[in-house]
Amino acid sequence: MTTASIRRGYHVIKTILHFGLDDLIPKHKKPWYFAIVRNSLFWVRNKHKTKSPAERLKLAMQDLGPVYIKLGQMLSTRRDLLDDEWAYQLAMLQDRVPPFDSALAREAIEAELGAPIATYFDDFNDTPLASASISQVHTATLKSNGKAVVLKVLRPNVEQQILADLQLMTQTANLLETLLGDGNRLRPAEVIEDYRTTILGELNLKLEALNAIKLRNNFLGSNSLYVPFVYEEHSYQRLMVMERIYGIPVSDTEALRAQGTNFKLLAERGVELFFTQVFRDNFFHADMHPGNIFISREHPDDPFYIGLDCGIMGTLTEVDKRYLAENFLAFFNRDYHRIAQLYIESGWVSEHTDIIAFEQAVKVVCEPMFNKPLDEISFGHVLLELFRTARHFDIVVQPQLVLLEKTLLYIEGLGRQLYPQLDLWQTAKPFLENWMSEQVGPKAMFNKVKSNAPFWADKLPEFPELIYDNLKLGRKLLGTQQQMLDKYLRYQQKSHKSNYLLITSAVLLICGTILFTQIVTLWPAYTCIGAGILIWAIGWRSRPKNRKF
């Protein structure tokens, strides 16, 4: 353990005590050494006793810096784990940090390019356009075509800082599994592992560039989403160069209203955009918070979204997609038994789950939702409540579904912020029903045959040879099986004969012994015993020697 990690660990412990987070651990769960640590830092007092535990956690994470802020933001989306108050407080965390020195930014960019910035760019602006915990963005003009671009570069030494904090988080999470009364329900170790995967993925800007290119290609010519062009030849692990956009932040409703944006159409397109990404492309933007979404300035009566920051993307298996679509349809049909069946069939909960008990639990949670109009029912909260219910039946956590739930909550919140009258069900239902019709029935079968036709056309010339080889193999197997059967029958015949003789000899020996003790004339006894020994010898010699068939 390095001096820096010891110092960081001390700062984390001090912050926990300063905000009174140690009070959240039940007294009977605190280990013997906890009091020693607490007393050795007697001058650190809880100065926030009047604040709620959730607010104290938010303030502590804000104080601990960017890595913990991003963890808090991720936790705020895990409403299947946290109560609403905790999720609300953590959602207020802001990933805003002071920019780092532009000289360091230049040095990092040139190290990735392998050449001075002026070789490829003009008008590089030392003042960053934006600054976050992991990266910083500068503007410039690309020399090759004169177009405005942005350069996203990772902060210096950010990987080492994140790995050090992740190590501390993992150790703390393992301790909390034991100390917290509901540690198993909150699953801190699982949450940190999920966070590790997410944040380490954000450290690879080359991967983000490839994600952006794929998402852009999926929506080329679309009237709902535009993804800026990425200059792949200038993108590396610590640097990404992309087209500069000039949209309006989706959270700036005043500016959108001032330009006459069609909010109803924009909200509906947001819902369609989500379901298209999930069910058509199986590749969805999983970090669609307001800071990553802009709205076009052109044609406000026919607006489209502009998507940035493709560091976190989600995918679902075909099985997950089908069960998810069926889940939503079953919910709106109030078919709770089918919902319970789907969770078990999909493997999201154990096959040994009591389906009747699970169905009743789902009904208790879902039925009250129908007391309000359909246009007020939230897809995200339906999924959230189902996950929360499944927690009590030991749901097998599916990271891809957690990303989906988070994204769906973002999209719904965004849609209703833009257009409060948005009827999510009426917008999504035709999409889900059309997608389901393509997955089952004659049309689905025809599409699958059609999609596999090139494969079978490629294999068709090999069919005669494959058929001939299989016939030869079949004949060979048949001959081998016949030989094994013959050997087995011979073995059985010998075995039966041997057993018969051995049993007969045993009977004769027993009879001879009885006669030997009961009568005066001994020749019958000797005859039985002699015959028994002879028959035993014959039976013993006739035993089958080999059991291999």
From Swiss-Prot:
GO BP: regulation of ubiquinone biosynthetic process; ubiquinone biosynthetic process
Q: Where are the transmembrane segments?
A: 498-518, 519-539
Function summary:
Is probably a protein kinase regulator of UbiI activity which is involved in aerobic coenzyme Q (ubiquinone) biosynthesis.
Q: Where does ATP bind?
A: L129, A130, S131, A132, S133, I134, S135, Q136, V137, K152
Enumerate the spans annotated as Protein kinase domain.
Answer: 123-501
Is Transmembrane helix one of the keywords?
yes
Pfam families on file: ABC1
Tell me what topology the record assigns in the membrane: Multi-pass membrane protein
Q: Family assignment?
A: Belongs to the ABC1 family. UbiB subfamily.
EC number(s) from the headed UniProt entry? 2.7.-.-
The protein in question is named: Probable protein kinase UbiB
Q: Per the record, what is one GO cellular component?
A: plasma membrane
Which controlled-vocabulary keywords does the entry list? Answer: ATP-binding, Cell inner membrane, Cell membrane, Kinase, Membrane, Nucleotide-binding, Transferase, Transmembrane, Transmembrane helix, Ubiquinone biosynthesis
This chain's source organism reads: Shewanella frigidimarina (strain NCIMB 400)
Q: Does the keyword Repeat apply?
A: no
Query: Can you tell which superkingdom this protein's organism belongs to?
Result: Bacteria
User: Where does this one sit in the cell?
Assistant: Cell inner membrane
Give the gene symbol. Answer: ubiB
